[in-house]
């Protein structure tokens, strides 16, 4: 079994999935993963579908030099955002895989939350292109390793409001007793 970067607090209520040596852009995939980290599974899947339809965008916070601006980034407080379709499809496939793993464990898929998602660099793949005057230029692709963990969140029960008991000193108790006698008479 392969070791994950983060171990879940309760492995019985968690399900994981990972993809290694995936031929998809590291930078785009990292931004896609950060956009949905901590979200509920159903919300994340719906959001990624909307990104593919260009209804919403992935905010680019770190790897955002020389990319265009769009108004769809306003909901995240950024001006630079994109629609990286290939990265979104890879992340969606891993989410679907992790959801199937969770259902096999008997977890409720409506309560699943993306508790951990991480994208790492895979070894670069080297290629070459032939240029004019007999020159050769090398170029590389930057594949990724992706891992994610879904955790079934516990229901949050609100603490009941306790009535605060007022502590009175003897002088305050005497004054309160005399006021009660006056109002009773």
From Swiss-Prot:
The compartments listed are: Cytoplasm
GO cellular component terms? Answer: cell surface; cytosolic large ribosomal subunit
| Top-level taxon in the UniProt lineage | Eukaryota
Q: Which Pfam families does the entry link to?
A: Ribosomal_L22
UniProt keyword terms in alphabetical order: Cytoplasm, Ribonucleoprotein, Ribosomal protein
User: What are the recorded GO MF terms, alphabetically?
Assistant: structural constituent of ribosome
Task: Show the SUPFAM superfamilies listed in the entry.
Answer: Ribosomal protein L22
Query: InterPro entries under this entry?
Result: Ribosomal_uL22 (IPR001063), Ribosomal_uL22_CS (IPR018260), Ribosomal_uL22_euk/arc (IPR005721), Ribosomal_uL22_sf (IPR036394)
Statement: the UniProt record of this protein carries the keyword Ribosomal protein: yes
One biological process term from GO is: cytoplasmic translation
Q: Is the keyword Repeat assigned to this protein?
A: no
Primary role: Component of the ribosome, a large ribonucleoprotein complex responsible for the synthesis of proteins in the cell. The small ribosomal subunit (SSU) binds messenger RNAs (mRNAs) and translates the encoded message by selecting cognate aminoacyl-transfer RNA (tRNA) molecules. The large subunit (LSU) contains the ribosomal catalytic site termed the peptidyl transferase center (PTC), which catalyzes the formation of peptide bonds, thereby polymerizing the amino acids delivered by tRNAs into a polypeptide chain.
Record's family? Belongs to the universal ribosomal protein uL22 family.
Subunit architecture:
Component of the large ribosomal subunit. Mature ribosomes consist of a small (40S) and a large (60S) subunit. The 40S subunit contains about 32 different proteins and 1 molecule of RNA (18S). The 60S subunit contains 45 different proteins and 3 molecules of RNA (25S, 5.8S and 5S).
Q: In its UniProt entry, what is this protein called? A: Large ribosomal subunit protein uL22
Organism name: Candida albicans (strain SC5314 / ATCC MYA-2876)
Task: Give the gene name.
Answer: RPL17B
